[in-house]
Amino acid sequence: MRRASDMAAVAYALLIFGFIFLPVIVLAVFSFQGSQIPVPPFNGPSLKWYGAVLSDGRMLTAIGNSTLVALISSLVSTVLGFLAAYGFARHAVPGGGWLKGLIVAPLSVSYLIIGMGLLITFTRLGIPKSLFAVGLGHVVINLPLCFAIIYSQMGEHHANIERAARDLGASDVQVLTLITAPMLWPALFASFFLSMTFSWDEFIIAFLLTRFETTLPVEIWTLLRSGLSPKANAIGTVVFAISIVLVAVIELTVFRKRAR
Amino acid sequence: MRGRRLGPWPFIAPALAYTALFFAIPFVVMAVVSLWTLSGTALDMTPGFGNYIRFFTTESFFKAIRNSLEVTALVTIVSVVLAYPMAWILAEKVPVRWQRMALILAILPFWTSYVVRSYAWLLVLAEKGVINSWLMGLGLLNEPVQMANTRFATVLGFAHFFVMLLTLTIYANLKQLSPNYRRAAADLGANGIQTFIHVILPLTLPGIMVGAFLTFVLAIGDYITPQILGGSNELLMPQLIMLQILRKPDFPMASALSIILMIVVSIAYLACARWLKLERA
Amino acid sequence: MKSNHREVPARRRLIAWALGSTMFGFFAWQAGPAQAAEEINALVWCDHDDPNLIEPFTRETGIKVNLKVYEGTGQALSLIEQSQPGDWDVLVVDGIDVPRVAAQGLLDPLPDDKLPLADIFPPLLMEAQTVKDGKRYAISEKFGYNSISYNKEKVDPADMQAMAILWGDKYKGRIAIYDYYLPVIGMVAMGLGKKTADLTEADLPAIRDTLLKMKGVSKLVGDVATSQNAIATGEVDILVGGGEWVTAGLAKDNPALDFVLPKEGGVLWSQAIGIFAASQKKDAALKFLQYIVSPEGQARLATSSCYWAMPVNTKATLTDEQKKILRWDDQPGYLANSQLYPAPSAELDAKMQEVWTEMLQK
C-alpha cells in the first residue's frame, strides 16, 4: 500500500519533470540542427548556429543592454523599496495603508498596461524611446516587489537592535546603513536577484519603449519574426546555460553560507 | 551625540514619488486618452465614451475579453491542479536534504528566456514537431494531430510556466505548516485523505489563492504566449490591444482596452482580496 | 498630419513641459554618449535587416544605418506617431501608400537626376503613386506578388489556378492565411471579380462573407514568420497571400514549395524608399537610397534573408541561378496579370480592419 503510493508519487514527479523539461531539451537539441528548420528529423550535430549567434553583433549588444538595464533598474528598485519599507516599518505614517497600497498597486497591473501607459505618456511629452525609458518601466514593476519582500522581513527584533544603536548615538542614516541593511541583507539580495530576473526577461515594456538599441527578449522576438531558424534555439540555449551557471553559483556561495 | 530622528517621509517619499510619477500619472494620462477617438487619421479630443461603447457593441472586440477570461481561468485551474501534487511530493516524499535540489530542478526552465520558451513549445507541438514525430514513429498515430496554433497550445504554454511558479509557492506554503496539525488530526482519528481535505487544504488555501491570483494577472496580460502559440485563430485581450497600435496609431482605443483589462483584473483582485492582503502577517 | 492633436493648449503644454522636465531631470545620465559622425535611422520592412545588405554600405561610406522593422504601413505610421520630428531619415513603405504618406508631409522630394530611373522596370516606376505635382516622393525598390504559395507534392497544382479553391472545402484544414488585411482582401476581391482599385464600402459584405468562409477552412492566420514556418514545416500546404517572398528563400531547403498566380491574377506588392522631410541627415539618407537602387544594392536586397523578391532595377547583379528562382523571365506575364494593393481611404481602411478582426475572431 505504502509502496504503491510512493511509486505513484515518483511517477507523477517524473511526469511533471518531463513536462517542464521537454521544451528546454527540444530547444537545446535542435540548436545543433544541421539544416534550416529546427524540427525533426535531426540532421546535426552542427555548431554553425552558435557561430551565427556569436557573430551577430546586435545580439551581443542586446545581451549587454539587457544586463545593464537589469542591473541598474534592480539596484534602484531595491534601494527605493528598502527605504520605503524602513519608513513604513519603523514609523507610524498617517494614511499609511493607502500609501502602501499605492506602492504595491503596480503588482496587480499587467506589464502591457504599464508599458502602454508609459508609451502614451512619453509620446505626448515628447520623451524619446530609449533603454533608459525601459529602465524606468522596469523599476515600476520591480519596486513594489522589492518593497513587499523587504517589508515582510522587517521584524520587531530588528527594531530593538536599531533602537539600541540609536541610544548609543547612531544617526538615522548610520542605523540604516550599518545596522538595518546588514541585518536584512538576505531580503535585499533576494529582492535584487528577483528584480534582475524579471527585468532581464521582460518583453512587452521593452518592446514598446525602445527603437534601435533594445534588449535581448525584443531582439529574439525580432529574430523569430524573420523566420524559423535554429539560431533562435542557439541563443535560447546560450541564455539558459548562462542562467543556470549564475543560479548554481548563487546557490553554492550565497545560500550555502547563509544556511550555516 | 544623539542623532536627530528623521520622520518617515525622507524614506518613503522617493518610492511614493516614483510610483506617482511613473505609474499613477501615466495611468491617468491613459484614462484621459481613452476618452478621445480616432476617426480616420484625425484625432478627436472631445471626451466621450465612444471607444468603450464600441468595445461592448462590437462582437469581435468583446469576444477578446471572453476568450481571455476563458483561457486564463483554464490556465489557472490546470496549473494549480498539476502543481499541487508536485509541491506535495516535493515537501513530503522527497528526503529533506534533497528537497532544495529537487525544487531548484523543478523551476530551472524558469530561467530560459520567456520569448524562447513559447517558441520552444511551438517546436514541440508543430505538425512536424517532436511529439507528432514520436507518436507517428511509434505507430500510435497515422496522421499528425494539430496542436500548435490552437487554444490548447496557448494553455499548455502558459501552464508550463505557471506550474513551476505554483509548485514553488505551494511548496513554501506546505513547509510552513507545522507537523503538529497532522499529528493532531491523526490523534483525533482522521485518515490521510480526511486530514488532507479538512486540515491541510484549508491551511494552504491562502497560498494557493495568492499563487492563482498571480497566475491570473500574469497570464491575462501576456501577449507573447498567445501570439506565438495561438496562431491568431482567436484574439486574446493583449493581442487586441497590440493590434490597435500595430495596424494603425489608434492610441485612444488601445488605452480604452487597457483600462477595461485593468478593471477586469481589479474585479478578480477584489474577489480574492481576503487572501491577498499584503499587510504584515 | 491632418489631425490637430499636435496643437496642445498652452496650459496643458506647460504642465506637460513641467512633468517632462521632471522626468528628464530625474536621471541626467541618460544624456548618453555623442553619436558617431554619420548615423541614419531607417524605418523598413524586415528584408532590409540583413547584414549582407547593410554592411557593404557602411564599409564603403562609413555611415551607420539603424533599422527599425515594421510590418504594414499602419504600424509604420504608428511608430512615426510615437517619435519626434527628425527621429527618422529613411522610410521604406508600400508603393501604394506613398500618396498617403506624402500627403501627410512626411516625405521630401527626391532629385530625379541622381536616381537610375532609366534602369527601372517601367511598370514599377509607379508615377501615379510616387509623383505628385511633378515631384517624386519615393522610388520603388522591390516587388512581388501576394498570391498562392503551395506544396506541389501535397496539392494538385491544377487546383491552384482558381482563387475559389481557397475558400472551398477540398483543402480544408491545410490552408494558412497571411495576416495582412490589404493583400488578402485584395485577393478575395479579385476572386469575386472585383477590381482592387475600385473597392468601396459596398463591396465589403461580400468580401467579409468570403473571408469568413476562408477562415472556416483554414488552419491558421499568421504574420510573415508564422506563415512561412507553417508552410515550411508542413503545418499547412497552401498559403493565402504567399508568393515568391515566401517560397524563393525556402527553395533550397524545400524544393516542393512553389507559387502561382491563379487565373484571376495576383496582387502586386511593391516597396518604395523615400527620405523624411524632417530628416537632419538628408545627404547620408540619399546615399543610402542610391545604394539600395544601385545594381549591387538591388541584388543584395532581392536576396536578403527575411524574404526574396524581384528587384526593380533591370541591371541588378543577380546570378542566373538567383534569377531563375525569382522567375526573372516570367515577370512580363505576371505583371500583366496582377493588380495593385487596395488603397482605401482612412474610413474604408478602418472598416476593412474591422472586417479583418472579425475574421480573426471567428
Residue ranges, per PLM feature:
Chain C
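A bilobed periplasmic-binding-protein/Venus flytrap-type ligand-binding module shared by bacterial periplasmic
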Residues: 147-154, 189-193, 269-282, 300
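Conserved C-terminal helix/tail region of periplasmic/extracytoplasmic solute-binding proteins
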Residues: 229, 332-362
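Mature extracytoplasmic/periplasmic domains
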Residues: 276-336
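N-terminal secretory signal peptides and thylakoid transit peptides that target proteins
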Residues: 3-20
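Early extracytoplasmic/lumenal segment of secretory-pathway proteins
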Residues: 37-100
